[in-house]
């Protein structure tokens, strides 16, 4: 090539898909797009669904819960907000509805560790009545709330883990107290929720760390 003005550009980055996921997750918090809240709820039927309804107009990125022995439990909630003003409005809404909460958005332990550790073993009251299911549903606004509404509040949820990873489908892990003699009734109930599930009660990972 002659009589041409050329510009050489050297570009590159020491990055892979694993690091890219970390960058995306931390940039959501750094740019104030994602907020992390620890919210206290009473351990009574219907309180889990009531909390989910508080976020009907927001995109939930995370929803983690484990039933405890005490009268109250804590739910770790991740939520995307348009701006700081909308986040303030959301906090006011929670307060008016009687929810006590703590903002963990800038808490390093929460961001680096806690969000991956919420869980623990079931309490003695659950015993062998807890059943674990793994499922997924299309990732779209309102999908999580829709599932919880279809599931209802007559059956007690003992464990719940949901994390929005930006894929086409959202994956959830749910623990349910089942005291029915006919164990097929719970399967039929889940089928009506519009979400496909696989039972994981015998999964060794569950037995070793969550049961």
What are these regions (language model features)?
Residues 1-26:
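Catalytic phosphate/nucleotide-handling subdomain of diverse soluble enzymes
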Residues 17-211:
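A conserved regulatory-domain signal marking ACT and ACT-like small-molecule sensing domains
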